[in-house]
């Protein structure tokens, strides 16, 4: 640089063809001066052990799996690598790859002997372990490359992959369908068992044995009281005389009933029934005109009352519902006896169901009460015109639908708060709550199984 003038130095700086030295050019000189080996030069100390048994089997009968042409490899050098990458674009983009290839080349050149040494050592180990390894391991080694080849074929075949994915989806859908069917069957089974348990609770318990002939004593006392009532009715019938009826028609003979004798008692009741039917037959001609007379009078009076008061008379309502009232009274008496025999849980179940239904309807805002309040609000709806405006201009407005979501929430006037609901459930079943009801419901059952079932349900009781 010192022999050049200043103008020449500036010209070299501004010129585009600046010669940049290539540091990789030194490797080509080394390759050109590389000493070629002849034969087994430098490997005289190696011991020839021959191929291993596994390699011989794979090479001989295994179709040349490890000795095929694709496993042989290709010898190359740095000159050939650099000759293939002469393009400028490839050099600029792949500088890192060239450095990696140089490193690999160094490793290949420097480690050829190491690889051969490792292969020889592997062959020695295989020969030393021939007695320990069996033929099963050899067969496994032969079968290993086949699944890899099949997997590579499937990966390259998109139709097969789509078919496999579709088959998996079909299997998944069938499994989900089976799961849903199983779930429905389990629900049906659970409902059936629940109904059976409820029905078993309604079955009356078995009657106890008769202690000391208590049933016979009660039967005799009931028959005695019925006999006394029968005699009183016959005496009353003899004292009543209908118009046109003779005294001989009403006269009845004496009936004797021996207590403690079933045969004589049966004969007594048969005779009393015959006499009662005979009296009814003899008094029928006299009773019929009397009943027709008073029936026509009552019917005429009821029609007059109905036309005047439109059925508002209590007497008229009683006359209309006379027969039904008797039946209802009898049924109410029977139901009261049944209710007396029921437990606390069974007797209060209907009332608690109604209370729970009211709670749910009030919380959800559905039901007849909510409908009535909605109708009242519709009637009392505000006018569209604003009253604050003057007479000449009425301010009319409509609430935007999207703006309704931003209105402050107004609590329900008749709604139930959380504290009220908690208080209701805590006061159920006479103040014992859900736990006390479930304890009473499980009387007669196994205590251990009942406690486990309640623990799983968390104290919740399903009616």
From Swiss-Prot:
State whether keyword Ribonucleoprotein applies: no
- Family listed: Belongs to the AATF family.
Q: What is the designated name of this protein?
A: Protein BFR2
User: Is Protein biosynthesis one of the keywords UniProt gives this record?
Assistant: no
Q: Which UniProt keywords apply?
A: Nucleus
What lineage does the source organism belong to?
Answer: Eukaryota, Fungi, Dikarya, Basidiomycota, Agaricomycotina
What species does this protein belong to? Cryptococcus neoformans var. neoformans serotype D (strain JEC21 / ATCC MYA-565) (Filobasidiella neoformans)
Tell me the segments the record calls region Disordered. Answer: 14-174
For this chain, the annotated S-S bridges are none
Q: Spell out the GO cellular component terms annotated for this protein, sorted alphabetically and separated by semicolons.
A: nucleolus
The record, for Pfam families, names: AATF-Che1 (PF13339), TRAUB (PF08164)
Compositionally biased spans, kind Acidic residues = 83-92, 99-144
Domain of life of the organism in this record? Eukaryota
**Predominant cellular place of this UniProt entry's protein:** nucleus
**GO BP terms in the entry:** maturation of SSU-rRNA from tricistronic rRNA transcript (SSU-rRNA, 5.8S rRNA, LSU-rRNA)
Instruction: Tell where it localizes.
Output: Nucleus, Nucleolus
